[in-house]
Amino acid sequence: MFWVLVLLSFIVLIGDGMISEGAGLRPRYVDVGAIFSLGTLQGEVTNIAMKAAEEDVNSDPSFLGGSKLRITTYDAKRNGFLTIMGALQFMETDAVAIIGPQTSIMAHVLSHLANELSVPMLSFTALDPSLSALQFPFFVQTAPSDLFLMRAIAEMISYYGWSEVIALYNDDDNSRNGITALGDELEGRRCKISYKAVLPLDVVITSPREIINELVKIQGMESRVIIVNTFPKTGKKIFEEAQKLGMMEKGYVWIATTWLTSLLDSVNPLPAKTAESLRGVLTLRIHTPNSKKKKDFVARWNKLSNGTVGLNVYGLYAYDTVWIIARAVKRLLDSRANISFSSDPKLTSMKGGGSLNLGALSIFDQGSQFLDYIVNTNMTGVTGQIQFLPDRSMIQPSYDIINVVDDGFRQIGYWSNHSGLSIIPPESLYKKLSNRSSSNQHLNNVTWPGGTSETPRGWVFPNNGRRLRIGVPDRASFKEFVSRLDGSNKVQGYAIDVFEAAVKLISYPVPHEFVLFGDGLKNPNFNEFVNNVTIGVFDAVVGDIAIVTKRTRIVDFTQPYIESGLVVVAPVTKLNDTPWAFLRPFTPPMWAVTAAFFLIVGSVIWILEHRINDEFRGPPRKQIVTILWFSFSTMFFSHRENTVSTLGRAVLLIWLFVVLIITSSYTASLTSILTVQQLNSPIRGVDTLISSSGRVGFQVGSYAENYMIDELNIARSRLVPLGSPKEYAAALQNGTVAAIVDERPYVDLFLSEFCGFAIRGQEFTRSGWGFAFPRDSPLAIDMSTAILGLSETGQLQKIHDKWLSRSNCSNLNGSVSDEDSEQLKLRSFWGLFLVCGISCFIALFIYFFKIVRDFFRHGKYDEEATVPSPESSRSKSLQTFLAYFDEKEDESKRRMKRKRNDDLSLKPSRPI
């Protein structure tokens, strides 16, 4: 019996050894390190969440096949050195992964260690956009990178129409690189960071006065949109000091990054002082869908935290990060790979290390395989779908946009990389096509600082007491637009009145002073004038400034306050106005022939209708009136007499067509004569100007000179500079130039005084005049809105009429004779008259042939009554024919029929 017991004991020992050796493939514990500052808000929340995840993973022994996940948290105590020591400690204890570090500064340092020892490092708080997978392949961000956070903020700024922002941030990698990313995103939207206020890392402890100093600087600046990218403790202090300085009032815009939402979620309620200082602030939170998993975890939180701290989004990502590691461990163990570590030859070969035990740092042999399992994770966690893109960024990054209000905070919308700004949850939009158009971007109403719901302008004039220097051209001609008052530096004119009226419509004061540019002896060069805005000589320039492409590249223009464009002016003559102007369209022969045909056609119709139409019968006087009335009423197609004969209708139809052509031509010609001036120059527009060899005048200082040389390829030798309207007129009259090219407003003013000239052809450029401001100047936008307001209310037109609506033109440089005018001549219509005449002749021929035939057939009965002499016989026949012609056809037929019957009754009857 004793030996049996010994044998059984030996078998058990052997079995235990075999089991232990086999179980080596699945270790009892898989170690994971975590490095956080547990005294911080993030550290406290993430530590609780990681422990909960560890318990959930280990609650199912089958998940890791009997192995357990063991997470050891190292408290870095906000100290960089301790953070490094914690990482080294985990590398010595064979940790397969490290969760952390908490800050991007340490992530940059420790990522080199992770790369060397092949230990994956996962962080959901170190979200620096510069931590790339190419540089640090073993560093994985398990929450959306701050690159997307800055993209969301940039789209918000663009959505509200702000062009400049101020960045206030701590001098650390995460904050600094985040602001750099923001600057890049803003630049693509024509916005910019106008000032960067950098605060030391420990500013609250070591130099709190530095916060006040920076806020005072910001207070005196132009921009009122401030981005705060810092830590919760620093951020709280910033807003408290800003409130004391009156910077949480109407007009300011404050946007805080995700640090504020973590504070709002975890500390509830906030201290009254802090809550009051945050009213009206916008902030963002990483979006996590409201899934059942999330709701269940939120419900557990109070029990997990014992009510000491609220759950924020970093707690959710901490929980999911543990599960990412656990699933990767499961896949590694399921692949039957041993979890093993080996010495790093680079470290073991180091000599003179003193007491440093660098040889204890070992390489994770399966690190690359384990990393591959991590980045290929595809799971649904409490934060939603977890999946990495090829560049290691999280799939479908999105944010909640939060507005801090009196009773806490409220959500005003979302941002997602898929669809931009929306009031619909991003997960509802992922199945739709991406639409990033401005019309598809929406957010709900915001309560801004100061309690206002009106979107702040985002900028004010700098509070430095300096007035804006507004450049004004000191013109030598066309002073209706801009001119210096005699004996002073004051200015007046159309452009000045428009500017002053627009300034009055702006809802804030615009202190300014006008500064003259030029000597007043000749017009200044406007390209140089505009360039002075770029180099800072002027804060803006006002005047008759054409908006052209070259200038828009260096300055921003307002909405045009007057339309403009280049036109060609050439000499003309004009017909003298007379009471008989209505006779000008036709030459005298044309009038005579037209009048004759009215009478001829009327007579022909009377002849054709006289015997059969009662309306063309009656006493001679009535018939003459009928002929005249019918003839001339056809001019207006208002004749009331009906034609019943076929021939009459045919003639009338042809005549009405002729009348239609004549009246239409008359109307068009009269309109042209009364409204269009007549040329005595071969220049008919820009095309003939280019092809001609004549000299061309232009206004000194105008862009027309460069345009003709560069765009129209007109030789510089053909161009003649002119300085005033009088020089224009003299040059055109004496033939110095064949034409002048200038902008339309100048030309209109010139023609109102000198009427012997006219615009030839159409405007061959389209532009306008505006006021120029520095690039991205918010004042340019407000001035444009004000100019539109002036236009809509009619005030802009009143200013125009005050300065430009005048006409002193009384002397004419010539007149146009009948031969030179565009009168309608007979040769243009002889074909119509010929057709009408032939039709009348044919109709009369047919008619007389028919009536003569009928007369000789029936009229002989009248002649048989007497046998006169030959002379009297011819006279009697003519009288009989005329009587027959004048007799109504029906009566003639009845008379002839009656006479025939009488003749038959007088013949003797034949005997029976």
From Swiss-Prot:
Region (Disordered): 888-912
Annotated compartments: Cell membrane
Signal peptide: 1-22
Tissues and organs where the protein is expressed, per its UniProt entry: Expressed in leaves and siliques, and at lower level in flowers and roots. Detected in the vascular tissues of both shoots and roots. Expressed in root phloem.
GO annotation terms (biological process): calcium ion transport; calcium-mediated signaling; cellular response to amino acid stimulus
Binding-site residues for L-methionine, renumbered to this chain: 544-546, 551, 703, 743-746
Major subcellular location class: membrane
KO phenotype (gene knockout): Overproduction and aberrant placement of lateral root primordia.
GO molecular function: calcium channel activity; glutamate receptor activity; ligand-gated monoatomic ion channel activity
Pfam assignment, any one: SBP_bac_3
Record field: transmembrane: 588-608, 618-638, 650-670, 829-849
Residues where glycine binds: 544-546, 551, 703, 743-746
Membrane topology term: Multi-pass membrane protein
Glycosylation-annotated residues: 306, 338, 378, 417, 435, 445, 532, 734, 808, 813
InterPro entries: ANF_lig-bd_rcpt (IPR001828), GABAb_receptor_plant_PBP1 (IPR044440), Ionotropic_Glu_rcpt (IPR015683), Iontro_rcpt_C (IPR001320), Iontropic_Glu_rcpt_pln (IPR017103), Peripla_BP_I (IPR028082), Solute-binding_3/MltF_N (IPR001638)
Zinc listed as a keyword: no
SS bond partners: 755-809
Similarity remark: Belongs to the glutamate-gated ion channel (TC 1.A.10.1) family.
Subunit-structure text: Forms a heteromeric channel with GLR3.4.
Role of this protein: Glutamate-gated receptor that probably acts as a non-selective cation channel. May be involved in light-signal transduction and calcium homeostasis via the regulation of calcium influx into cells. Could play a role in calcium unloading from the xylem vessels. Acts as a negative regulator of lateral root initiation and development. May restrict primordia numbers and position along the root axis by a signaling process originating in the phloem.
Extra remark: Overexpression of the gene leads to calcium deficiency and hypersensitivity to potassium and sodium.
Name this protein carries in UniProt: Glutamate receptor 3.2
Organism whose genome encodes this protein: Arabidopsis thaliana (Mouse-ear cress)
Species classification: Eukaryota, Viridiplantae, Streptophyta, Embryophyta, Tracheophyta
Gene transcribed to yield this protein: GLR3.2
